[in-house]
Amino acid sequence: MVEARHLPMERGLGKTDRIDDWWKSPLAMGIYLGIAVMYATWRGFMEADFWIFEEFGRSAGNQTMAIESNGSHVLSPLFSPLVVPGQDGLGSWVPESLWWMSPAMFILIIPAGFRGTCYYYRKAYYRSFMVSPAACAVSTPFGDYKGESRLFLFQNIHRYFMYLAVAYLFVLSYDVLLATQFHATGSATSYGVSVGTLVLMMNVIMLGGYTLGCHSFRHAIGGIRNRFRNGGGAVAEACWKSCTKLNKNHGNWAIYSLFWVMFSDFYIYACTEGWWTDLVLLGGL
């Protein structure tokens, strides 16, 4: 019987025989994810009605969730679908007693849950924040890497968040449609395209590439099959191959789509604050 032998490796945080700059990637990813989380948290709470957040957003008489100039409606993806307790639409399902909560608090669990349990992001924050494993052939501060066990088995909920994330793409696509409609008091609806419309459209494309290239989605549409048979098999195979192509660059889609979500929100925030102007490129009022 062959006995497995482990190669000798120095013990201690960051100890390794590697001579390359292995730490640059987890450090850069840690900074990137940290900035994204802090920004999304700040913007999400900005529209809340308690504590210091009363000085911003709705509480201060401002509205930074959507561009409403020139008769348009360009809603930030951080607040979509818009849920305002006690008001029309989805807000009618929420008790009015929760008026103090930011609309983002009701919906961000879906994208946050999907990304937080994503296979790529799990690798990223395990390395960047938990340093376990820090990198290949790099020692950890907590002994040998044991893999995802015990509490971390909860990460398997990712496959269920995937279905919600796919549905979320339709919601964001509807927001793009609304962003092409311009309304004026007492007149019919006209159509057009602004820079904000294109920003939201690109956001859907980026999120589509990330979501539809997800490992769980790839498994759901084809990974569970031993072979593709007749009677829809050709269509299923084509979908699976397309998903596989996206999956090959899943890490890039994860990084760039997250950036674009934050940029989309910042663009809308900047326009509502008067720093930028949402130019109408085609049609409009």
Predicted regions and their residues:
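Membrane-embedded alpha-helical bundles that constitute the cytochrome b-like, heme-associated redox core
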Residues: 1-285
